[in-house]
Amino acid sequence: MVRRLTSPRLEFEAAAIYEYPEHLRSFLNDLPTRPGVYLFHGESDTMPLYIGKSVNIRSRVLSHLRTPDEAAMLRQSRRISWICTAGEIGALLLEARLIKEQQPLFNKRLRRNRQLCALQLNEKRVDVVYAKEVDFSRAPNLFGLFANRRAALQALQTIADEQKLCYGLLGLEPLSRGRACFRSALKRCAGACCGKESHEEHALRLRQSLERLRVVCWPWQGAVALKEQHPEMTQYHIIQNWLWLGAVNSLEEATTLIRTPAGFDHDGYKILCKPLLSGNYEITELDPANDQRAS
């Protein structure tokens, strides 16, 4: 007698479908195994209950049975929809945009942060600057992206503690001219405030410590297209100043999306910085005169 072995994936899917609320099971059969975004809808036609993303929509949706919150969300859901993308980048970008626009009940809120700030190094001085006042995509010597001024100063203080930098010279506390700071007496400051260390050495150590937090300036003159491919789909992500303007199916359609970004997009920067600079994707500069150059 030949015994047929069932794959773990098929066993998981069969069990998951059986455990799913009965009123949602009809939507499960058509779930694609492709990358993209999926939405759980409740009674409202305008506000989804939950928006998620995955490189395999079917597998991810079927796994939504792990916590009491997920079970509560499924009970309130009335239907499931999805949007396929060419890959993980497109799924991440589309998910972030839809969550901001539609504010689903069960998602962590992604709102435009009007207090978004960074540390800016000017010669030997560090200032806290805000994205609403400075173009973070172009401004030089920016380090870290913080939700507010307090978080930025806490990060600077942590670096000062690790590197024995002077709070006074960093503007974290008042400093009397010509006198050592209190932390110097405790050997928590290397003494740039009292001549034990030169200001140049202090500034160099500060810059070296901040380097890991550097905000990369937008390296192109204008918009670019990042090509993302799937066996069943190709997308060109149109990006300018780290802001995702949208996706098109061909470069000829790119000009319909090009516009001047209204501000710095923190989520776009986090998602796009690594893939754009990795060299793993085809990048095409989008010239206003349509002279497109691939790199």
Swiss-Prot record:
Keywords, ordered alphabetically: DNA damage, DNA excision, DNA repair, Excision nuclease, Hydrolase, SOS response
Any one GO molecular-function label of the UniProt entry: DNA endonuclease activity
EC number(s) reported in the record: 3.1.25.-
UniProt-listed Gene3D superfamilies: GIY-YIG endonuclease
Enzyme type, top EC level: hydrolase
Entry superkingdom: Bacteria
Entry GO terms, CC: excinuclease repair complex
Triggers of expression: Repressed by LexA, induced by DNA damage.
PROSITE patterns membership: GIY_YIG
GO terms (BP aspect): DNA damage response; nucleotide-excision repair; SOS response
Residues of the GIY-YIG domain: 33-108
NCBIfam families from the UniProt entry: PRK10545.1
Function: Incises the DNA at the 3' side of a lesion during nucleotide excision repair. Incises the DNA farther away from the lesion than UvrC. Not able to incise the 5' site of a lesion. In vitro, the incision activity of Cho is UvrA and UvrB dependent. When a lesion remains because UvrC is not able to induce the 3' incision, Cho incises the DNA. Then UvrC makes the 5' incision. The combined action of Cho and UvrC broadens the substrate range of nucleotide excision repair.
PANTHER family documented for this protein: EXCINUCLEASE CHO, UVRC/OXIDOREDUCTASE
Name used for this protein in its record: Excinuclease cho
Organism: Escherichia coli (strain K12)
Lineage: Bacteria, Pseudomonadati, Pseudomonadota, Gammaproteobacteria, Enterobacterales
